[in-house]
């Protein structure tokens, strides 16, 4: 392997000459052999956007030459596009400020820009990783800015569309099933009737509320720390840098990023991402409920509830021929469990900042992005391979409806709660129908039962 010598404030170190990173990245590789977690493409892209925007603004403010700006922008564009992803090798489990990954981006952009200019990698000429690429920045404000860029893009580009896709499919099912009457269940026990469409409308509403929750948290994610530098004072930045840089990032992404009004909060705390993670946890809880309902309703096919059928996607057992399992519900419930667990880590990280800097930044963004990705992919998979293929089993639905003792509730206004309860208990004890039980007890006639117990009149408000 051909190497070159890179330098930093600690001296010289050999680096694989085929790589664009420099001394600080190399030292991090030596010191943090921890797990397999690497920063995802979303964070690398965000750092590229940030470095490009900073160069544009620094040039606009007269702090960076036009030639240097062009070189940095060209190299940063390659980072943004993903062309240089292999040159970002660092573990998530590193310094809590993300300093090594910030320097990784500075070094890669510097060396690639030097190469574009026809220079020698590692020379730091004509583009210096600190003086030029990192101008008017500190890891303490760049890394949280990249965190917010990455999270905001993924919430907008992946999670919201995935939730909408699933919601729309459930809305179609709600309309399709609006006239199919079934027995309700509370406490896992029989309850009064509703329609299958009404049941599915609950899922639609959950998803609509969750989409609204994501949109409600976005304004706090749009607030950027850039311009705070080391502790929030803005040391070594132009007075206009923070606002202009946020505006440039907004232009690059098409999202309404703004400069955080208080940089001390933006560096020392990550309450906005803790809040975001809480929203993701809420979505996970909703999806857990929906996925569980679907697999219970489809259980069987002969010895379970079996009121709906779901697509048969793959064999379900290596020993039981013909078995098909609710695998999409299972992936979704596992994803939900993981997202809830991720939120615990984010909460601990968010609560553990000290004085002017939170040093759990990589942990926080790793888990937030992981939760967004898991929820997004899970919703798309569930919609494509399960939700859109759900069909009602009308025979089973009618069987359960007609067998339910809870239809007796319709008799309450006519014969009173106590007498209705007697009919239900007697029918259950003797294995008869409600109608037979009521007639036997002399509490109603056949005609009265037929007039009063009408499931189709029990699915909306009524005092008749």
From Swiss-Prot:
GO function terms (MF aspect): fumarate hydratase activity
Position of the signal peptide: none
EC number: 4.2.1.2
CDD domains listed in its UniProt record: Fumarase_classII (cd01362)
Superkingdom of the organism of origin: Bacteria
A Pfam family that the UniProt record links to this protein: Lyase_1
Catalytic residues of the enzyme: 187 (proton donor/acceptor), 317
Subcellular location: Cytoplasm
Pathway participation: Carbohydrate metabolism; tricarboxylic acid cycle; (S)-malate from fumarate: step 1/1
Principal location listed in the UniProt entry: cytoplasm
Stored PROSITE patterns: FUMARATE_LYASES
Important for catalytic activity, annotated site positions: 330
Single Gene Ontology BP annotation: tricarboxylic acid cycle
Binding-site list for substrate: 97-99, 128-131, 138-140, 186, 318, 323-325
Matches recorded under InterPro entries: Fum_hydII, Fumarase/histidase_N, Fumarase_C_C, Fumarate_lyase_CS, Fumarate_lyase_fam, Fumarate_lyase_N, L-Aspartase-like
CC annotations in GO: cytoplasm
Functional description taken from the UniProt entry: Involved in the TCA cycle. Catalyzes the stereospecific interconversion of fumarate to L-malate.
HAMAP family: FumaraseC (MF_00743)
Additional note from the record: There are 2 substrate-binding sites: the catalytic A site, and the non-catalytic B site that may play a role in the transfer of substrate or product between the active site and the solvent. Alternatively, the B site may bind allosteric effectors.
Family classification: Belongs to the class-II fumarase/aspartase family. Fumarase subfamily.
Name of the molecule in the record: Fumarate hydratase class II
Upper lineage: Bacteria, Pseudomonadati, Spirochaetota, Spirochaetia, Leptospirales
Gene responsible for this protein: fumC
């Amino acid at each position: 392997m051909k190497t070159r010598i890179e330098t930093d404030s600690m001296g010289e170190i050999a680096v694989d000459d085929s790589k664009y990173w420099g001394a600080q990245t190399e030292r991090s590789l030596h010191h943090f052999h921890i797990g397999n977690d690497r920063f995802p493409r979303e964070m690398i892209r965000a750092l590229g956007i940030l470095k490009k925007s900073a160069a544009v603004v620094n040039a606009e403010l007269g702090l960076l030459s036009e030639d240097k700006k062009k070189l940095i922008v060209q190299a940063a564009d390659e980072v943004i596009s993903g062309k240089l992803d292999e040159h970002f090798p660092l573990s998530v489990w590193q310094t809590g400020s993300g300093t090594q990954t910030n320097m990784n981006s500075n070094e890669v952009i510097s060396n690639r820009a030097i190469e574009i200019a026809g220079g020698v990698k590692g020379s730091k000429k004509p583009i210096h990783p600190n003086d030029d690429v990192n101008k008017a920045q500190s890891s303490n404000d760049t890394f949280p800015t990249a965190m917010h860029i990455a999270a905001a893009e993924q919430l907008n580009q992946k999670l919201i569309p995935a939730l909408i896709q699933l919601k729309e499919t459930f809305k179609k099912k709600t309309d399709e099933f609006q006239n199919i009457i079934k027995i309700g269940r509370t406490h896992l026990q029989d309850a009064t009737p509703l329609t299958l469409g009404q049941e599915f409308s609950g899922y639609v509403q959950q998803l609509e509320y969750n989409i609204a929750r994501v949109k409600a948290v976005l304004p706090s994610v749009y607030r950027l720390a850039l311009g705070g530098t080391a502790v929030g004072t803005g040391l070594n930045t132009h007075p206009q840098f923070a606002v202009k840089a946020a505006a440039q990032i907004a232009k690059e992404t098409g999202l309404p990023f703004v400069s955080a009004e208080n940089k001390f909060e933006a560096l020392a705390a990550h309450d906005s991402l803790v809040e975001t993670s809480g929203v993701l946890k809420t979505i996970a809880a909703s999806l857990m409920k929906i996925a569980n309902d679907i697999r219970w309703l489809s259980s069987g096919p002969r010895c379970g509830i079996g009121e709906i059928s779901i697509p048969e996607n793959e064999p379900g057992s290596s020993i039981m021929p013909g078995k098909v399992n609710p695998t999409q519900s299972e992936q979704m419930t596992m994803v939900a469990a993981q997202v809830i667990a991720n939120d615990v880590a984010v909460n601990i990280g968010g609560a553990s900042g000290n004085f002017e800097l939170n040093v759990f930044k990589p942990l926080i963004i790793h888990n937030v992005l992981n939760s967004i990705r898991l929820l997004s992919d899970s919703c798309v998979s569930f919609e494509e391979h399960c939700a859109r293929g759900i069909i009602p089993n009308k025979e089973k639905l009618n069987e359960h409806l007609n067998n339910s003792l809870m239809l007796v509730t319709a008799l309450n206004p006519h014969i009173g709660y106590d007498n209705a309860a007697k009919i239900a208990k007697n029918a259950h004890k003797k294995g008869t129908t409600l109608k037979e039980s009521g007639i036997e007890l002399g509490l109603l006639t056949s005609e009265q039962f037929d007039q009063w117990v009408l499931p189709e009149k029990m699915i909306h408000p009524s005092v008749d």
